[in-house]
Amino acid sequence: MICFYGSLGSAHAAAIVPNVVKKVSSFDGTVIYTRDAHGADYMHTQEGEKLPIIHCIKDTPGWEICDELKPYVQTVVDNPAFGCVDLPRILSSYGEDVSRIELCGLCTDICVISNAMIVKAAFPEAQVKVDSSCCAGVTKESHQTALDAMKAVQIEIL
């Protein structure tokens, strides 16, 4: 997921966009975007109660894939939670050998780590990688903590 504006946007998030554009524009494989997508009732959900910052409300600014990445959109999967539990099924549906998976985006410490853990659990023998130069966390410290946690479960950090 890449959106660097909106209520959860940051300069650190905006700074990764050129790296992500370079990566996806030259990537020879399937690119799947997962996108945080909440409804108008967000503040009445468990996440809204624990993270009371209205963000990624469907069809509002901050929910869209940023303009710089729109030319490279192949597949977008909206998910109402931190991780996309359908991601393993979606990856398998392409009929390709799911032996190498690389993730990047926002937020390292929320969505990226959740999706990395989901795909690593679903494909334990796959090479799961996260490009740290194409990720940003809520804070630099939480970004690093997430990278360290992923490394501990054999997710390769680039």
Model-derived features with residue positions:
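Active-site acidic carboxylates
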Residues: 1-76, 96, 129, 138, ...
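Histidine-anchored nucleotide/phosphate-binding helix
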Residues: 19-26, 113-123
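Active-site-proximal beta-strand/loop segments in catalytic clefts of secreted hydrolases
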Residues: 34-37, 80, 106, 133
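Internal catalytic-core helix/loop-beta-alpha segment
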Residues: 59-110
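Short acidic-hydrophobic, aromatic-tinged amphipathic segments that line or gate anion-handling sites
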Residues: 77-78, 156-158
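Conserved strand-to-helix beginnings and helix N-cap segments that scaffold or border functional pockets
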Residues: 88, 113-116, 140-144
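A short glycine-rich beta-strand->turn/loop micro-motif centered on a GG-aromatic cluster
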Residues: 102-106, 126-140
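Short phosphate-binding/catalytic loops that engage adenosine nucleotides
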Residues: 124, 155
